[in-house]
């Protein structure tokens, strides 16, 4: 199954990202790749323009070797209709 078979709207994208956060080892790699996969499910130009980044920057920042700034992550998520929410950690 391809990611674009699962990502149909903002809600399914949020579910996908939340699952990837659970699988992430703490280095952000799973989340970064997940955001990259969601970007590919959209028209990349429609994400790049409101996020004020180039298409090439998007592909570069959200691949396995990417290292996007927190600001870029927020702008890209907002351009996709998503946001970040902080919750208390369970069983710390």
Q: Which role fits each region the language model picked out?
A:
Residues 63-64:
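Residue-level detection of the helix-turn-helix DNA-binding "recognition helix"
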Residues 40-60:
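Short alpha-helical DNA-recognition segment
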Residues 30, 68-71:
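Charged, alpha-helix-enriched surfaces in structured cytosolic catalytic cores
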Residues 26-46:
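Short, contiguous, helix-prone interaction/anchoring segments in small proteins
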Residues 70-87:
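DNA major-groove recognition helix of helix-turn-helix/homeodomain DNA-binding modules
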Residues 92:
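Long, contiguous binding/interaction regions
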Residues 1-33:
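N-terminal flexible/basic segments that precede or flank functional cores
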């Amino acid at each position: 199954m391809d990611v674009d078979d699962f990502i149909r709207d903002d809600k399914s994208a949020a579910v996908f990202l939340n699952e990837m956060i659970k699988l992430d080892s703490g280095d952000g790699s799973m989340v970064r790749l997940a955001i990259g996969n969601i970007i590919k499910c959209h028209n990349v130009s429609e994400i790049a323009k409101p996020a004020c980044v180039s298409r090439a920057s998007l592909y570069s920042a959200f691949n396995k070797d990417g290292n996007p700034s927190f600001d870029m992550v927020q702008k890209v998520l907002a351009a996709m209709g998503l946001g970040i929410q902080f919750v208390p950690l369970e069983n710390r």
